[in-house]
């Protein structure tokens, strides 16, 4: 499984891509492979505030329903609407087509506290 080096990772298997004062958030390849076939994704609305380490949505697979935990705090400025019609994108393209939300950061230092690709690989035994 590939773990992109340009992203940061949470212990709950979300990835974060920094774009200026905003971040894009999704779930990792490891997470989607553990969940199995994704059949539904529930995400917050644009304008919602999310708090680090708190649930902000959920992913339903044929195996289970898993909550999504916010790796950072901020305001949701965009939601990937394609996932409501094509939840399988999470399995097919977890790092590109299946981004979940874009968030305007309330504290940019939170990103630095997330795991590097190397640390995430160690945590998931993917090194």
Swiss-Prot record:
It comes from the Bacteria. Keywords: Lipoyl. One of its GO terms (cellular component) is glycine cleavage complex. The keyword Ribonucleoprotein does not apply. CDD domains: GCS_H. PROSITE patterns: BIOTINYL_LIPOYL, LIPOYL. Its cofactor is (R)-lipoate. Binds 1 lipoyl cofactor covalently. One of its GO terms (biological process) is glycine decarboxylation via glycine cleavage system. The modification N6-lipoyllysine is found at residue 63. Residues 22-104 form the Lipoyl-binding domain. The glycine cleavage system catalyzes the degradation of glycine. The H protein shuttles the methylamine group of glycine from the P protein to the T protein. PANTHER family: GLYCINE CLEAVAGE SYSTEM H PROTEIN, GLYCINE CLEAVAGE SYSTEM H PROTEIN-RELATED. The glycine cleavage system is composed of four proteins: P, T, L and H. Belongs to the GcvH family. This is Glycine cleavage system H protein. It comes from Bacillus cereus (strain AH187). The gene is gcvH.
């Amino acid at each position: 499984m590939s773990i992109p080096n340009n992203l940061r990772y949470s212990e709950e298997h979300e990835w974060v891509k920094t774009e200026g004062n905003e971040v894009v958030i999704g779930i990792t390849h490891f997470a989607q492979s553990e969940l199995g076939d994704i059949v539904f994704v529930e995400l917050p609305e644009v304008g919602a505030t999310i708090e680090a380490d708190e649930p902000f949505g959920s992913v339903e697979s044929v195996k289970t329903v898993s909550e999504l935990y916010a790796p950072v705090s901020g305001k949701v400025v965009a939601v990937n609407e394609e996932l409501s019609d094509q939840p399988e994108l999470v399995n097919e393209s977890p790092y590109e087509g299946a981004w979940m939300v874009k968030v305007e950061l309330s504290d940019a230092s939170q990103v630095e506290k997330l795991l590097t690709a190397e640390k995430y690989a160690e945590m998931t035994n993917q090194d």
